[in-house]
From Swiss-Prot:
Organism: Xenopus laevis (African clawed frog)
Keyword Cytoplasm applies: yes
Any Pfam family matching the protein: PDCD10_N
GO CC terms of this entry: FAR/SIN/STRIPAK complex; Golgi membrane; plasma membrane
Subcellular location field: Cytoplasm; Golgi apparatus membrane; Cell membrane
Major location (coarse): cytoplasm
Gene that produces this protein: pdcd10
GO biological process: angiogenesis; apoptotic process; Golgi reassembly; regulation of Golgi organization
Protein name: Programmed cell death protein 10
Lineage summary: Eukaryota, Metazoa, Chordata, Craniata, Vertebrata
Family statement drawn from the similarity comment of this UniProt entry: Belongs to the PDCD10 family.
Taxonomic superkingdom: Eukaryota
């Protein structure tokens, strides 16, 4: 049975989503290791990237097994959200024009606010302010994306338009998750949705980096 285009896109998104721990958790480890042994760090990074590409989710499995073996009780989804705000070199747009650098800055700002959710969620007043800040950051990022669209022409505009639509879709999903949270109080679902939105933010940068 052949997959539809939509099913293929969903599978691709899910596959890349499970690879989030590679850059959110392991990349900072590799960066620290580079200060001690550059060659070993580069070899290890390349090995993890290759293994993750061939077996999506492998990094998460390895980290989870290590935590289990050490009997460390940790909310992995929450921890991932706290760590996901850092810049990932592979996703940063390198073009020097102000519009592209602003794209990096707006994406960074949104990710940083989202990563604070675990610290704010139990304080209703602070969390409501955080939600307002997230809404503003989403709008600012989309405005910046639209500004780049207006100023620059792309052969692969469809890929950019698709990624923008995906980002908007996950933004709305995040908003719906928040509404549900205020009814059922399940913070984990908010963390999951926030991680997905951070991932979509990175994919916007990656798409611009690829076609720009």
């Amino acid at each position: 049975m052949r997959m539809t285009m939509e099913e293929m896109k969903n599978e691709a998104e899910t596959t890349s989503m499970v690879s989030m721990p590679l850059y959110a958790v392991m990349y900072p480890v590799f960066n620290e290791l580079e200060r001690v042994n550059l060659s070993a760090a580069q070899t290890l990074r390349a090995a993890f990237i290759k293994a993750e590409k061939e077996n999506p989710g492998l990094t998460q499995d390895i980290i989870t097994k290590i935590l289990e073996k050490k009997s460390v009780e940790v909310n992995f989804t929450e921890s991932l959200l706290r760590m996901a705000a850092d810049d990932v070199e592979e996703y940063m747009v390198e073009r020097p024009e102000p519009e592209f650098q602003e794209l990096n800055e707006k994406a960074r700002a949104l990710k940083q606010i989202l990563s604070k959710i675990p610290d704010e969620i139990n304080d209703r007043v602070r969390f409501l302010q955080t939600i307002k800040d997230i809404a503003s950051a989403i709008k600012e990022l989309l405005d910046t994306v639209n500004n780049v669209f207006k100023k620059y022409q792309y052969q692969n505009r469809r890929a950019l338009e698709h990624q923008k639509k995906e980002f908007v879709k996950y933004s709305k999903s995040f908003s719906d998750t928040l509404k549900t949270y205020f009814k059922d109080g399940k913070a984990l679902n908010v963390f999951i949705s926030a991680n997905r939105l951070i991932h979509q933010t990175n994919l916007i940068l990656q798409t611009f980096k690829t076609v720009a």
